[in-house]
Amino acid sequence: MVDKPKHRAADGRALDDKGNPVVDEKGKPILDKNGNPLKPDYTKDFSFKLGGRIQVDSQINWNGNGPYGTDLANGVGFRRARIYTEGVMFRDYEYRFEYDWARNNGGTQGITDAYLKYIAIPNFAVTVGQQNEGKSMESVMSNNYLTFIERSLPNNAFIEAGPNSKYQIGITAETWNKFALDKDWAMPYTVRGGLTTESVGAPGPGNSSGNSQGQTNNAGGTNSNGTNINRNAFSGDTSYQVVGRGTLAPFYQKDVGVLHTGVWGSWRSVNNNYNTDGTLRTGGWAYQSAPNTDVDRTNWINTGNLSSAKVCAVTIKGTCTAYKPVKQVNNVAMFGAELAGAYGPVHLSAEYMQAQIAGYGYSGSDTLQGFSVQGGVFLTGETRPYDVKKGTWDRLVPNNSFVGGSGWGAFEIAGRYDLMDMNTLHINGGSINTGTLAVNWYLTPRIRFMTDWVHVFSVNNNNSLRAAGGKCAFPAQGSGAAIGCFSGLSPDIWEMAVRLDY
């Protein structure tokens, strides 16, 4: 969070030089004892903060019973290595810029956040620039606060490692408040929505403006938005989406508990850019996910690009003069539902999400979907904090941090079950379900050791309705049709991680 200047309260209201709000909660000026309006203190209109995070993961696998090429890699690597600057300028504007030097989530771009936010109106903000698109309770939450080393399968497939990074250029508006029932019990809510396009330099089918297919364009060279080379050389327009999320906590009492509900949805127009011979140049759409792993991010489920090359429709004198699409995704509609709660040391959460694919070669039955259920308990008695402004979990502060020998920090045990199904009538993306057990040690609010044991219960990448897409080829490649090689495998994965932010 940005360190707010001292002239502004937590709810955004300006303060005078003594720290008193100059307007009430309805925006009406507050008068001093002489009947004059209190004046804001503008002596500290600017703030600056520099910070970052270092996250290191390790992975050991037991899955040597599969075909050649399906073994997951053991190893150690940086999950994230970020540095950021943020603050407030001219009293009413918040800024943030963050760069990830590791960017090990399936993307190559380094920029995560790069935005300007207007915060002058209490409980309201407008953000312009690259920002989190705002889908899912788990994805809106900072990865500094995650219970598990990796987010759930559907979250990873649809949002985190989807066809477009969740950090997208756009404009969003948000509001938050609470229905105060008494001094201790309130019903906080959030509403956020806007228009987003694509990420800065995002690779893959989700980026219609770069040569994500690695093909040569008609100008004789390759084009990638990641290097910002000649966007007009047949690179295509950017896609766009309308997205929104709303949350309500029917029960919330700080340091006691919360009951959270939420829904979100989006509609994205997908661009498909073709060469003159009907082959796909850029664009399209695809979903994929690894089995809750990071060091080895092989995609065990993968739809492949849902747009394919066109076929010849009209031939004149042996030359094709017109083409027609066979498989072409034109738009994707997504929906998600959230339910979470915490009381005392126990916390639970569940999410469901789906993506409806529409276009040539697809029907109303082509809906990809997944869900996750997770829960945990703090053995040292802490209650999981709730962020009322974002409608998600907040940073845990141990009752007794492991500092100077005065305490042992906080200990947490947790479990999760998740499932992702991307097999439909016309899509053979595969299905997978896993279980995860976790033990976390929070030494301080900003230093944490994590260990997860992941078991893959089943993988089914052989859809009989489209058998060709599920066949096993050698060597197995997670990004191609060879995902069929993973069918029937049930590996165990041990992961360990260190999380530090400052």
Task: Please give the residue ranges for each predicted region.
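Extracellular/lumenal/periplasmic "stalk" regions immediately C-terminal to a signal peptide or transmembrane helix
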Residues: 1-4, 8, 17
